[in-house]
Amino acid sequence: MNKNFEEQEKRAKGGIRLAREEVFKLVFGVEATESTSDELKQNFDIYLQNDEEFIATLNENQLEFIKSSINGIVENYSNIKDIIKKNTKNWAYERIGTVERALLIVATYEFIFKNTPIEVIANEIVELAKEYG
């Protein structure tokens, strides 16, 4: 399938889904390189500057969702990771796959700090896991 067609199809399916996917990708980059939350913020700033063509395709709600999510994750990064660590029984955080860690970070942030309904989070995270996991 043509990559441009795939992107258009995602935008048509729902703006926040595409925005959530972008948040996931940024968090994944940080988790894959074992970077800090400050580096997540730096990567986000670089993303905004260097991917102007893609950013221009986002609507105001999508861009605001991405910005608020990244800022919220950066602000609460260590708390989010602590919550995940406390709730993973018999499994070390470091042993969780990078994709799965990034998905857990996004899901935990949305559930605890954005009060997104758990049904929405579960559906969206499962869809991202199918695509990237």
Name what the model sees in each region.
Residues 1-132:
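N-terminal interaction/assembly modules
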